[in-house]
Amino acid sequence: MPKTIHLCWFGGGDYPVEVKACLDTWRRILPDYKIRVWTGDDARALGIPYVNEALDCRKWAFACDVVRFYAVYTEGGVYMDSDIFLYSRFDDIAATDADFITFHEKCDPDHEDFGLQAAMFMGVKGNRFCREMLDHYAKEHFLNEDGSMNLLISPMRMRDVASRHGYVAEDREMRLDILTVLPTRRLKPRKRYPRSKDCIGEHRVVGSWRKRPLGRRITKRIEHLWRAVRYAICHK
């Protein structure tokens, strides 16, 4: 598996401080990996209707849902959302004898209906799971016939594709024919999820594309300013 981290960054603009903090962990913990940035122009060049429709609506995350599978399918390596904060290397996972590896995404202990982790996964070039995901999206449109948006998220789509190969929503390691799924504890899906000894990182779910209520936006803005000050102090 190549030591490449694929990152999608659409819409231009600088990385927010929360993303910079996450990328710093990648560079510090994985100095031997190169970061491959996929832009909106790269995404549009694929000529996939679902992607183009999502880009036209400025729904970057949904366009990225497809590009991430294309990146790993065509080049191999590791895909990570920009808000993955690493705690440690994952050499043991990358060395697993599997063509595609991801994690369960059980955000709360009482969740029974959960999907697969789309914020971070890895695979070899030409792996079958990414191929099947691309085939799935090739039949989809982001815009429905009535003009509404198709907002089914990729963790659920991944689960549906994996279910054809024996996947069931049980938070344990599963080695299936075209993918391996690791327990949620190996990658925290949310801040509130407890950190285990073998946890490699956390999905911080910055979600800068989301529309939030005014009160929540104010709270997030204050948190952002505090992180910006702390980041500036730490990087003097």
Please describe what each predicted stretch is:
Residues D65-G77:
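Small-residue hinge/turn detector
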Residues M1-C64, M80-K236:
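Glycosyltransferase-associated regions of secretory-pathway enzymes
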